[in-house]
Amino acid sequence: MSSLDKTMHFDFNQNKGKNIRDTLEDVYKALEEKGYSPINQIVGYLLSGDPAYIPRHNDARNLILKHERDEIIEELVKSYLGKDK
């Protein structure tokens, strides 16, 4: 079986959940303060990977760039499904 036939396994550090949650809350607040639609801007960033969707205001861009987008998406899915406990 070639390596292309194998399923990849993601295993993220369990302690990052709170940090990602805190980061998203801080980014959300910064976007609100700047008058943007926070959900639209965060989704735009997550889909495109373009940090220009996140302002530098209150260091929001640097904060969100500390996390991989796939880790953020994983936390969002776990939270949505109630599996974040």
Curated annotation (Swiss-Prot):
Protein's name according to its UniProt entry: UPF0297 protein Ldb1606
Q: Which Pfam families match?
A: IreB
Which HAMAP family does the record associate with it?
UPF0297
What is the similarity comment for this entry?
A: Belongs to the UPF0297 family.
Give the source's domain of life in one word: Bacteria
NCBIfam families linked to this entry: PRK05473.1
